[in-house]
A protein has these predicted regions:
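Conserved alpha-helical substructure of the radical SAM core
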Residues: 41-71
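Conserved AdoMet/S-adenosylmethionine-binding subsite of the radical SAM
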Residues: 58-70, 79-205
């Protein structure tokens, strides 16, 4: 099954995408959501124009043995591919840790990947009731939050992160999201400020943080055992 993994891009070395490890990133092709701030819209179709064969990925990893410590399966939405669990297992057989970037679009598929995963960067889009305005897909928030429950129950190491574009969030909405996350047991939360430039929705333009944002960052630092503010 792993031979069928559709990879639309590869970053050969990163210190940012898997905390504490030297890793490469595989951008898995395909996503069922249409997040307005998505900065990799070329990965949304199930099949892209620039595909990297799984055999070539494995050959690359073999050459990097002794340097790389982990592989991050990103997207797109990697869990939509049935080949993902087998691909992650193969990476672990090579002595590498398997990281996953996911929004848990389909909770059952997300659950199938978790046993093969060493760390998850989990994307919480918004409160469940607010998520459709970001993803463009009805009931996406319910799926997102159900997968978060599965992640917290699994014991797999994680960070939860929310991408914030100030045309889609205000301070109070972000505060409520953070309170809800802390209430369900999230201990590690990252706010990612959305990039300007290439994104799926051209109507989203660079928007400065509202007055009071600095005070909110202080609140979130006090709320979570681990909190970080970063650029997406």
């Amino acid at each position: 099954m792993s031979a069928a993994l559709r990879v639309g891009g590869l970053v050969p070395l990163t210190t940012l995408d898997y905390p504490g490890l030297l890793a490469c990133v595989l951008f898995c092709q395909g996503c069922a959501w249409r997040c307005r701030y998505c900065h990799n819209p070329q990965l949304i179709p199930a099949r892209g124009e620039a595909q990297i064969r799984w055999e070539d990925v494995l050959a690359f990893l073999q050459r990097r043995q002794g340097l790389l410590q982990g592989v991050v399966f990103s997207g797109g939405e990697a869990t939509l591919q049935t080949a993902l669990p087998g691909a992650m297992a193969r990476v672990r057989e090579m002595g590498l840790r398997a990281g996953l970037h996911s929004a848990g679009i389909q909770p059952r598929a997300f659950a199938r990947a978790l046993p093969h995963t060493d760390w998850v960067g989990f994307d919480v889009k918004a409160l469940a009731e607010d998520s459709d305005a970001i993803t463009g897909v009805p009931r996406s928030g319910q799926a997102n939050w159900r997968s978060l429950e599965l992640l917290l129950e699994s014991g797999v190491a994680y960070e939860c992160r929310s991408t914030v574009h100030w045309q889609l969030f205000d301070l109070e909405r972000l505060r409520r999201l953070a309170m809800r996350l802390r209430g369900v047991g999230v201990e590690n939360f990252v706010v990612q400020l959305a990039r300007s430039g290439r994104q799926l929705d051209p109507q989203l333009i660079a928007t400065p943080a509202p007055q009071g944002a600095a005070a909110l960052w202080g609140e979130l630092e006090a709320l979570f055992p681990r909190f970080e503010l970063r650029d997406a």
